[in-house]
Amino acid sequence: VWQDDDAWPNTFRQSWLIPAIEYIQADRLRRVLMEKMHVWMNGDFDAFLTPSFSDLLLTTNGTGHPALVLRTGMEGTKPHGTTLIGRLFDEGTLCRLGMAIESKLNVSNIRPTFNT
């Protein structure tokens, strides 16, 4: 059995050693970040675009802001995508924007081919 430091069982077991106070402090920090991002996003825009798998992915995983990865084209046989991040509890607007962008880019029906 693989018992390297990077093996998922060992990584998972490390979470058992997090003291409760550190967990609570991290959750409080997450809440502050969530509130700041919520205030920032309730400005003049409904959503924003970011490269797929950018550093904001970690942020939205913590804050709960919805993120939608959409197709933006193909380079040969390699698909390209972009992430659209929306306001809290506003997934409907995010989906409508994603559909409009894919439609405008004429990529909504493009699928990569797979050799089987």
Regions found by a protein language model. Name each.
Residues D46:
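Conserved acidic residues
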Residues V32-G43:
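Short, well-structured alpha-helical segments in soluble
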Residues V1-M34, R71, E75-G81:
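Short helix-loop capping/hinge segments that flank enzyme active sites or metal/cofactor-binding pockets
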Residues G81-L88:
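A short, well-structured catalytic beta-strand-centered motif of the EAL phosphodiesterase domain
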Residues T60-G62:
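Short hydrophobic alpha-helices that are characteristic scaffold elements of the AMP-binding
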Residues L94-T116:
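Short, gly/Ser/Thr-rich active-site loops of penicillin-recognizing serine hydrolases
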